[in-house]
Amino acid sequence: MDRLAGSALFTAMLVFAGAASAEAQNKQLIQIEADREKDVYRFVPAKVTARAGDVLIFKAVRGSPHSIVFEGRDLSEATHEAINGAMGRRTGDLSSPLLQTDGSEYRIVVPRVAPGVYHFYCLPHRAYEEQGELRIAK
């Protein structure tokens, strides 16, 4: 195989590999709502299944401010660090910044952690049980 053909084949392989990995990364929108009049405080969907590398987009839809805080009680040290590392602009341990206005978003790229269920909640609306769960698939 001459150099030009080999180079073209290598480039095609890189493009294909990039496309395959881009397809493997799923994006999921999780809306966050609070409505005092209707007594509705929720993440929609409240249960999300994802894999490492997937992108979770939390969007404040109504009733801001909102936040995303992961429960840390039963996390191993490595998992705790991985989740903290995935949460850019953290304002505290396992905690996103406040989404101050409706329409604002917060993104998390799911870190490589053990399969299982990870619970999260909205700190400003925790008393109203605004909570959800992230299920990490095998």
List each model region and its residues.
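C-terminal segment of classical bacterial N-terminal signal peptides
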Residues: 14-21
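Bacterial N-terminal signal peptides that target proteins for export
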Residues: 1-9
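Extracytoplasmic copper-binding redox domains, predominantly the cupredoxin/blue-copper superfamily
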Residues: 22-138
